[in-house]
Amino acid sequence: MARVENMTERYAVFGNPIGHSKSPKIHTMFAKETGQSLSYEAILAPIDAFEASFKEFAANEGYGANVTVPFKEQAFSLCDELSEQAQLAGAVNTLSVLADGKIRGDNTDGLGLVADLKRNLGDLCGLQVLLIGAGGAARGSVLPLLHSGIAKLTIVNRTQAKAEALVEIFTSYGDVTSLPITHVGQSYDVIINSTSSSLSGEVPNISPDTIAPHTVCYDMMYGKQSTAFNLWAKSLGAGQTIDGLGMLVGQAAASFSIWRKVTPSVEPVLAQLRSELIG
C-alpha cells in the first residue's frame, strides 16, 4: 500500500485487555532516546475481530505492532512471512507492515528473556537450564535459549506430553530434553518459571533439590514485591532471583530494533519502570 510521506509513523500494541500495558511508555522512551519520530498507542481489539482491527490500523499508516494475549496465535495466522523464531514458536508478538503491504511476523519474547539473563549473569555458555512450563511463553523461549550457548535445556511441565512435544520441535537445534516434573532431582544453574503460577500465589510442583546455592531462579512474572516462585526459591537458598520485568523491556527493545533498525538502551527504561512499580 502507498505510504504518505512526512507523517509520523504509527505503532501500537494489540490486546484484550490492554489498559495495563506498559508498551506505550516503553516505546515512547525508546523513541526519545534514539531520536526517532513515531507514535505508539494501545489498541483494545475485540476478541473476535483482531484481524480486522489490525488491518484497519495497517491501512491507516500503521507500520508495526506488538501483540499480547490473547492474540499471538491469531497474529501468527495473519502473516505473509514469518521469521524462523516465530515459525517455531507458533506465535507472533511483533508485526511489521512491509513496503509492499505484506505482513511479517516475529517473536521477540525469548530474545527478551535471553538478553535479560545475559544482562544479569553475563555469559550463559555451559549452563544447565531447567525450564518449567510448556505453554506459549516456554515455546517462544526455547530457540533463543538453545542459541545462547547453554549446555543443556531440560523442560518439565505438569502434563509431560506437552513438554515432550516441545522437545520434538526443537531437538535438532540443541541439547534439549524433558523429564516428568516429579522426577527432577538434580540442581541446575538456572531455573526459569514460564508459567503464570505466581499470579495466583502458587509455585510449580518441583523438588527443592533443584535449587543449590549457585542456582539462579527466573520468574517471567513480575510485581511490586517478589513473586511467589522467587520467594520460594529464596527460602531454599537460591543464589539469585530475577523477575520478568527485564524480559518485558528486552522483548520491546528487540521489536523496536526490527522496526527502526536501531537498538535502544534497556537500562534507563527498566530503571524507570522498576521505580514506578515499587514507588
From Swiss-Prot:
Assembly: Homodimer.
Protein function: Involved in the biosynthesis of the chorismate, which leads to the biosynthesis of aromatic amino acids. Catalyzes the reversible NADPH linked reduction of 3-dehydroshikimate (DHSA) to yield shikimate (SA).
Organism for this UniProt entry: Shewanella halifaxensis (strain HAW-EB4)
List of catalytic residues: K72 (proton acceptor)
Amino-acid biosynthesis found in the keyword field: yes
Keyword Electron transport recorded: no
EC number: 1.1.1.25
Catalytic activity entry: shikimate + NADP(+) = 3-dehydroshikimate + NADPH + H(+)
Annotated shikimate binding sites: S21, K22, S23, T68, N93, D109, Y222
Lineage: Bacteria, Pseudomonadati, Pseudomonadota, Gammaproteobacteria, Alteromonadales
Name the record gives this protein: Shikimate dehydrogenase (NADP(+))
Family of the protein in this entry: Belongs to the shikimate dehydrogenase family.
NCBIfam families given in the database record: aroE (TIGR00507), PRK00258.1-2 (NF001310)
TM ranges: none
